[in-house]
Amino acid sequence: MCGIVGYAGKRSAQDVLLDGLEKLEYRGYDSAGVALAQEGGIRVVKSKGRLDALRQKLAVQALAESSCGIGHTRWATHGEPSDVNSHPHSTPRVSIVHNGIIENYGALKERLAARGYTFESETDTEVLVKLIDSCYHGEPLQALHEALGMVRGSYALAVLFKDFPDTIFAVKKESPLIVGWGEGENFVASDIPALLKYPRDYSVLEEGDLAVVTAQGIRFYNAFGEPVERQRLTADWDQEAAEKGGYPHFMLKEINEQPAAITATVSPRVEDGMPDLRIPELTDERLRSIGTVHLVACGTAMHAGMVGKAAIETLARVPAEVDIASEFRYRDPILNKDDLVIIISQSGETSDTLAALKLAKSRGVPVLAIVNVVGSSIARAADYILYTYAGPEIAVASTKAYVVQMCVLYLFALRLAYARGKLEEAETKRLTAELLRAGEVIKPRLDDCEQIKYLASRFVNTQSCFFIGRGFDYALSLEGSLKLKEISYVHSDAYAAGELKHGTISLITDGVPVIALATQKQVYEKTISNAKETKSRGARVILFTTKDAVVPEGVADYIVRLDEYEDLLMPLQLIVPLQLFAYYMAVLRGCDVDKPRNLAKSVTVE
């Protein structure tokens, strides 16, 4: 959730750190700070609030030039947002920034207090830096090994020692951390976008790794303190992809990038008109042996999993289950050796999802990961990988990553159905061709947004909103509702339309907007009937349906018409106006679209 940046080299460390932290703002934060190695000691400057507040403090203090330092954006877990709780935390000899949670910090704090240490903040990180200080006798590696041996929890650390002013010590346990390779300069970061302005080569720290980073090079040690080598990767995202490119917000840019993201993700996986997963080990024979598919994810990725479940069961007639990752890992799921667990995560670092993956593997069940970041923790741990090629997604609210997650799940469902003899080759090719043109299908929704803007202006002051739908439309109701409440702060709930009479309809009051999704022909009349029920109780109904659908008079106040498209694939088109509705509602309400309050892009702690 928090952001870490470290730099050792020839440039101004302060400038590099601030630039890197700005690139990590999408991860969410409530305070920020830097520690700079200078002659005579380590200078720490930190501030509650946005990076601008930190910049102002730095400008006033006018620190001496430094070429080595660490920086941090904090999302509060222990201790409220404040200057004193912000990172870095320091002693006269050691300064650290930390992502993660130290579970036994209370017991460690008592032990350190008995030795004379005092504490100013409420954070687990202050306990950790003083624990490291208590173990330091001139050898940083020894101090870190001894201190971290007493710690229970997760952490990504960047550490400065006063006695080693040109060196950053980076340590990783259950929280993501990478190091970047430059020429006469090297970097530490919690995510790739912080490095895109600089040389693109990076290495991912593995579990228990410690990296010693100087301007001259990087050395790696494993959890046992043994020197090791780590694979050097190259980021294929360009810097412009992580910029707004003329759009007022990253979210709007990323919504408009969806056609290109679909093409980039689907096209390489189609061979002679047939879906080809490009995973040699996942043969048709292996696909035929699958018992149950378990789709596990959090938030928006879980909503993509719901679409995947429906596609898998509809096309391949294989039972599929969808689980919220944080529930899956604690409910003792029934898993069999012939099952397949599909893990879905944009970042590849989502804490609960990674834990669910580890649970599946501990039961001997193979795992297929759908992720957007090469070399991420989930990608490295999975048996099979399907990368989505969305490029960097900076806005906290996911849009293009969600769409390509659905695309990959459609490809998987199509290949699974063909391998198991549930789809003939001709029908498989037809549906694959329809999927290939999805980018073309959604483009008109992006080119003409006036109706959606108008609807947002009509309902900008609403206090509550309800989404209803059936089948695929219900899965889209959940995602549309989530987008609206994430970024516009309007209370919103989504329900299976058939559940209205089981309690939900009591919430319908005069003037409340109900967004009814009715794109599925099989259940169209049922959904229309449900929409009419809400209308008769005073709701203002916004109906999303297809151009050819016959809408009875008096059902809806507003109708948004979509192009005719394959029912199975309609979520790819329907989601676009729902994303845009949430976006324009947020803009009109004056909300921070890209960085909504209290939310983080990558949830790397439980």
Model region roles, listed by residue range:
Residues 163-164, 175-177, 183, 202-246, ...:
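A SIS-like phosphosugar-recognition module
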Residues 1-244, 248-249, 257-292, 330, ...:
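Conserved short alpha-helical segments that host acidic/polar catalytic motifs at enzyme active sites
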